Design a protein with these regions (language model features):
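Interfacial loop/helix-cap signal at membrane boundaries in integral membrane proteins
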Residues: 2-57
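Alpha-helical membrane-interface segments at transmembrane helix boundaries
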Residues: 43-54, 94-106, 129-132, 136-140, ...
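Hydrophobic mid-bilayer segments of alpha-helices in multi-pass membrane transport proteins
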Residues: 58-64, 75-87
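Conserved small/polar residues in nucleotide/adenosyl-binding loops
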Residues: 204-205
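Glycine/proline-centered hinge or cleavage motifs at structural transition points of membrane proteins
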Residues: 196-197
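Generic hydrophobic transmembrane alpha-helix motif, especially the helices
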Residues: 103-106, 111-114, 123, 137-173
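Transmembrane-helix boundary motif in ABC transporter permease subunits
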Residues: 65-70, 85-95, 107-136
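Short juxtamembrane and helix-loop transition motifs at transmembrane-helix boundaries
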Residues: 33-47, 60-71, 123-132
């Protein structure tokens, strides 16, 4: 009896990779219409913002950004922003920069539309918060670029996968902060609001 024999010594072939690949392809083909519907509003907002940002003249955007930089961080940051924006235009990357900015605005918009309602639900239901907490932990632990692999597989190549990956990574802080902010409102403030005739939704706002 040869005790050195191992399963790999026998000519047995298990097409596991082919089974997995075939099932994934079939599932993706069947679910393609669903993911197109999901990506449709993202594409609409993204394309609209990209068109608007590329339509606005360079001097106007320059003035707006430099003014915002001055108002938020002072003259030094405003000068730095001015030099940076001029440099971007000189190296002929202005259109790409506006596309990136449109992606950021789109991701922020959808994060707010999804995150704030979920945060309100989490603040009103301890059970929902307990269920949601480990999911948010996983979403924040995994690096953002890791999301691109399944997202590209589901939504295809383009700008939309980048926006979806950004939404997934940026969503947990909005949900957590909304939940925490509502939970930290004192009972006295809530009672005062109810006494003035406010509904719970208005108090949350």
């Amino acid at each position: 009896m040869n005790l050195k024999l191992a399963p790999s010594d026998f000519e047995v072939y298990i097409p596991l990779a082919e089974w997995i690949e075939g099932n994934i392809k079939e599932w993706l083909f069947a679910q393609r219409p669903l993911f197109k519907k999901i990506s449709a509003p993202i594409d609409t907002v993204l394309n609209s913002l990209e068109t608007v940002l590329n339509f606005i003249p360079f001097p106007l955007i320059l003035i707006i950004f430099v003014f915002l930089a001055y108002r938020t961080n002072g003259i030094k940051f405003a000068i730095f922003s001015l030099i940076s924006l001029i440099f971007i235009d000189l190296v002929d990357l202005w259109s790409e920069s506006m596309t990136t900015l449109a992606m950021i605005f789109t991701a922020v918009l959808f994060c707010m539309l999804i995150g704030i309602p979920l945060g309100i639900l989490a603040s009103r239901s301890n059970t929902f918060e307990i269920i949601l907490r480990p999911i948010l932990d996983i979403m924040q632990t995994i690096p953002s670029f890791v999301y691109l692999i399944p997202v590209v597989m589901l939504f295809g190549v383009g700008l939309t996968p980048g926006v979806v990956a950004t939404i997934i990574f940026a969503l947990p802080p909005i949900i957590r902060l909304t939940n925490l902010g509502i939970r930290q409102v004192g009972k006295g403030f809530k009672e005062a609001g109810f006494s003035l005739g406010l509904t719970l939704s208005l108090i949350h706002i």
